[in-house]
Amino acid sequence: MTASDDRTTATAAPLFDVREFARTARGSHRSELDLSDLAKAPLPADAARLIRILRDLERSTMQRMRNLLVTATHKDARVTAFLTTWAFERFWIADALDYVLETAGEPLENPDTGRPRKLLSERAERRGPIRRAIAAGFAGSQLVAAHVTAGLVDEWVVSAAYRRLSSATASLRPVVDLVLSVKARHIRFLSEEAERRLTASPRAQRLTRRELTRSPWPIGALESPAEDRSFFESFVFGSPEGRAEAGRIAGLVAALPGIGAGVGSTLNARLVP
C-alpha cells in the first residue's frame, strides 16, 4: 500500500451541504399525499406487492447502518452525519408506503414466500458484525469509498423500481414523485462522495469493485424471500424497458472512476432475470 492509496479524501472540496440536509430533513408525508384516486380503483396485485417490498427495503436501514458502523465508516464525520438524516428520511418513506397500502385497503405484509436466496457470491455479505469488523480492519479507511458507492448504486436500483411502479399504476405517480424528490438529495450526496473518493485512491477503486460484485441488489434484499427477489427482478427489469433501465444503470456504474465495464456487466447480469 502506498501513501496515495491510503488517502481518504480527494482534492476537490465537497459541495453537498450536510448541515443543510439535516436542517431540512423531510419527515411524515401523509399530509402531503392526495390519495383520493386510490379509492376509485383497487391497486393491481403486482403494484401492491412491489410497494410492500419497497417499504421493507426502506425499513432495512438500521441493519445496514449496523453493518457500516462497525467499519472505518463510523469514523468519517461527514458520512455518518449524512447517514443519520438518510435513515430518518427513509423511515418516513416507508411510512408513506404504509399509508398507500392502508388507503387502498391492502394488507401491510406480504405472505411468507419462503427462504432467502443463498448465493455463493453474496456469502461475504452474510457475515455478522464481529467478522465484518475484523475484515474491515484490514481494508482500512478506503472502505468508505466502497460503502458510499454501493449506496449510490442501490439508490439507482431502487429508484428504477419506483419509476416502474409509477408507469404501471397512474394513481401512484404523486407518491412516486414525492419519494424520488426525497431520494434526489441522497443520490446527490452519494454521487459526489463516490466520485471524490474513487478519484483519490486506486485502492478505494479495488475495494469498491469487490464490493459491487458481491453485493445483493437491492442491498436490503439479502434476507428477503427468494420469491420476492425474483418478483422484483422480473417486474422491474424483466421487460424490454426494464432491461434498458438495467443497462443504463450498468453504464453509470461502469463510468465511475476506476470501476469499468466488467463490473457494470456483472451488475446488469444480477439485475436482469
Describe each model-derived feature in a short phrase.
Residues T2-P273:
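Non-heme di-metal
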